[in-house]
Amino acid sequence: RVLFRSNNIKGAMLASWVSQASFSPPGLSIAVAKDRSVESLLQIGDSFALNILSEKDFKEPLKRFTKPFAPGEDRFQGMDIELTPNEQIIIPEALAWLDASVKERMECGDHWVIYAEVLHGNILKSDSLTAVHHRKTGANY
């Protein structure tokens, strides 16, 4: 789950393609479809938090963040969120989180591959495994 705040705008997306990209500095890559509204909030210099969900606790946030929301509706209303050192959102169900800053963007067909440097992170639940979301098809979201 990629969560972000930019001024008063908060957003979330389920990231299917996340990968470690570098050791020094620590970095990751995320693929974002060009037609996603969140893409405009992941420009060079923008920050975000990658919330890594637990296999035990991923179903509720998955339901919450994949349902349609009205424009401007707060997806986090009623949630007991915390903030990273860069003031990005951590949800209560997170197993771990990474606070990152976008450094590069590469155009790849109908997606952007975003490279971000990891600035901070923490493991919140060391007794659980990472959730894996299996899609019925990789042809669309």
Predicted feature descriptions by range:
Residues 1-141:
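Basic, polyanion-binding surface patches
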